[in-house]
Each structure stands twice: as C-alpha cells, then as structure tokens.
C-alpha cells in the first residue's frame, strides 16, 4: 500500500449516460450514483494512505446537489493536510450552500475543473449544453474571492458555429475570469457520440484514428487549427506555468485583447524558429523580453524589472540572469 503515497488516484462516484450533455436535475435517473457509505469508506482509505491527489472522473460531479455536498463535507471534515481532490463541475449549477462550503476548504484541498467549452450560445446549443454563462461567471468570481481553490477553465476549438472570431471572443471571455489554468483543447469526435452523428452536417473533418481530433470544420480551416495549436503552446508556457504572473498582465495590457498577445507571441516564436519545448526557464524569459522589445521598446525597463521579479519569486537563482539590469552603483 505504500505505493499510494506517490500516485494520483482516478476515482468515480457517479456515472452519466453518454447521451446526456449536462445534467439539469438532481433527480435525473440517467445518472447512476454510487452508495455514499462505500464512497466515504474508499475516500478514507485514500486519506489514510496520504494519496497526493484523488481525481474524480465524474463528468459533472455536482449535478446532484446532495451527493456533491456529502462528499465535499466529508473531505473537509477528514482533511489530512496532504491530499488534494480534483472535481469536474458545472459552475452555473453551484448554489449558495455549495459555494459557502467550498469557501471553508483548506487552501489546496480542492481544485475545480470547469468546462466552459465556448461562450457562443449557438455553439453551446449545438452541442446540447445549457450553460447559464452569467451564473458561471458569478460562481467563478465568488470562488476566486476566497483565494483557496485552484480553478481550471476549459475551452474547446472546433465546435459547430465557432469561427475564428467567435473563438477569440470565447478565449477573451474565459481569460477575463482569471483562472489559474486556461485549458485550450481541441474537439475529439468520439465513436458513438452525438458529434460523430452530426460530423457531416457540421463539416467536421477529424483524424480517422485515436484521438479522433478535429482537423477542420465549416467554420475553422486547417490553418486556423494550426494557428490555435500555436496559441495553445504560448498559453501553456506563459500563462498556465504561473511563472510570469507580474510580467504577462502588464505586457498583455499593451495589446487589444489577451488573445492578440498570445497569437502574436506564437507568430514571433514561429518566425524566429525558437524552441517551444525547452526545459530552460531562463530561455523563455529571454524570448519573452525579445518579443516585448519588438512590440513595446519604450517599456523595456519595466519589463526587465518584472521579469527579474518573477524569476526570483520562483527560482533560487545562484547568479543574475543575462537580461537583468546592472545594479552596481
């Protein structure tokens, strides 16, 4: 059993029919719930073993209010100070009682993955998601205000009716919610899914073998998909890494919108032939400052200061980085 101390456990407490896009009722009989007594026994085992993370794979964990509350109360009351629990939820379904309970959680006890997918209402309707975006935003703001829960927000490129302009709006909408992680994914047309049935109607062309990822649609060309892949890489490097938390917001403010900065940064990497997959963090700082020099040379003194601040905030650097100003008097 010692192996559990170094493993992520994937766990399921409920199962939803593949045909159900979003569970709207806590008494929806298409959702099968596991016995809560058994669930609590199993969770206690993981807690006793000090598992670093238990990742719930329930498709919409909080579609049943009572079920979600019982589990959240249990992990809050039996917190071992080590184990983290990851849940995929629909934030617009959260009510006041759930939000109040989440606010009491130890920082780091819970992280939430919220599948926004798109903020285009026509797109959401086409994929049978009935998300109340205003409620979703309100819930995310409320969760953020407590500073105790790590929030992931997910977008999916390649959905029906989402052209480049629409996707850019969705990206900027989600970015404005300031998640700790912004996951930019690409549609996967799974066998037997609704979108497989509708692929021809929507002009969705996808890979013929796993992961069956979208190649292009009526609304997004193959070139658009490649462009978004590059933007995804920049978001991973410079936003989701949480290594540039002071420099990126200031630099981004010089652009029309967040997407515009990441899009242009992706072009910069591509045109210069710079490596995206490099373990050297100093390299990423250096490239970002070169980009800043190209886009806003008048702001370079501030950008260098912020880069050094971000670096020393996270690194035990033994020497000053090459991009640091000379502090000799």
Report the location of each language-model feature:
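General structural signal for secondary-structure boundaries
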Residues: 1, 35, 59, 90, ...
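Radical SAM [4Fe-4S] cluster-binding motif and immediate context
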Residues: 1-145
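Glutamate identity and glutamate-enriched acidic tracts
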Residues: 12, 41-42, 70, 77, ...
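Conserved C-terminal portion of the radical SAM core fold
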Residues: 40, 47-57, 82-88, 106-118, ...
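Radical SAM enzyme core and accessory elements
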Residues: 233-329
């Amino acid at each position: 059993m010692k192996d559990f101390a170094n493993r992520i456990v994937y766990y399921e407490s409920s199962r939803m029919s593949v045909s159900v896009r979003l569970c709207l009722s806590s008494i929806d009989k298409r959702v099968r719930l596991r016995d809560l007594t058994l669930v609590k026994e199993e969770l206690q085992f993981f807690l006793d073993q000090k598992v670093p993370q238990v990742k719930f794979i329930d498709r919409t964990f909080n579609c049943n209010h009572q079920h979600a509350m019982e589990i959240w109360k249990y992990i809050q009351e039996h917190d071992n100070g080590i184990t983290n629990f990851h849940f995929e939820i629909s934030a617009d379904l959260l009510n006041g009682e759930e939000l109040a309970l989440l606010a009491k959680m130890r920082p780091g006890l819970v992280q939430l993955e919220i599948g926004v997918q798109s903020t285009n209402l026509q797109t959401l309707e086409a994929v049978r998601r009935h998300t109340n975006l205003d409620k979703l935003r309100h819930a995310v703001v409320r969760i953020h205000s407590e500073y105790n829960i790590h929030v992931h927000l997910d977008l999916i490129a390649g959905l029906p009716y989402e052209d480049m302009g629409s996707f850019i709006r969705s990206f900027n909408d989600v970015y404005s919610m300031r998640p700790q992680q912004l996951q930019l994914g690409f549609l996967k047309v799974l066998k037997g899914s609704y979108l497989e049935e509708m692929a021809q109607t929507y002009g969705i062309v996808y890979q013929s073998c796993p992961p069956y990822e979208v190649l292009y649609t009526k609304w997004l060309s193959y070139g658009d998909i490649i462009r978004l892949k590059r933007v995804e890489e920049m978001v991973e490097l410079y936003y989701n890494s949480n290594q540039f938390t002071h420099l990126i917001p200031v630099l981004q403010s010089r652009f029309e919108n967040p997407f515009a900065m990441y899009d242009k940064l992706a072009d910069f990497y591509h045109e210069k032939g710079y490596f995206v997959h490099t373990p050297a963090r100093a390299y990423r700082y250096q490239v970002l400052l070169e980009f800043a020099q190209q886009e806003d040379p008048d702001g370079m003194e501030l950008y260098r200061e912020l880069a050094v601040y971000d670096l020393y905030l996270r690194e035990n650097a033994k020497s000053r980085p090459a991009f640091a100003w000379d502090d000799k008097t």
